[in-house]
From Swiss-Prot:
Modified residues (Isoleucine amide): 21
Signal peptide stretch: none
Protein name: Kassinatuerin-1
Organism encoding this protein: Kassina senegalensis (Senegal running frog)
UniProt lineage: Eukaryota, Metazoa, Chordata, Craniata, Vertebrata
Residue runs in coiled coils: none
Function: Shows broad-spectrum antimicrobial activity against the Gram-negative bacterium E.coli (MIC=6.25 uM), K.pneumoniae (MIC=25 uM), E.cloacae (MIC=6.25 uM), P.aeruginosa (MIC=25 uM), the Gram-positive bacterium S.aureus (MIC=6.25 uM), S.epidermidis (MIC=6.25 uM), E.faecalis (MIC=12.5 uM), and the fungus C.albicans (MIC=100 uM). Has no antimicrobial effect against P.mirabilis (MIC>100 uM). Has relatively high cytolytic and hemolytic activities. Its alpha-helix has considerable amphipathic character.
GO biological process, one term: defense response to bacterium
One Gene Ontology term, aspect cellular component: extracellular region
């Protein structure tokens, strides 16, 4: 997931979902 690079600014739930993208 590309969201991981943005950092802890994003809730874990969103990071988990972005991991599927």
């Amino acid at each position: 997931g590309f969201m991981k690079y943005i950092g802890p600014l994003i809730p874990h739930a969103v990071k988990a979902i972005s991991d599927l993208i």
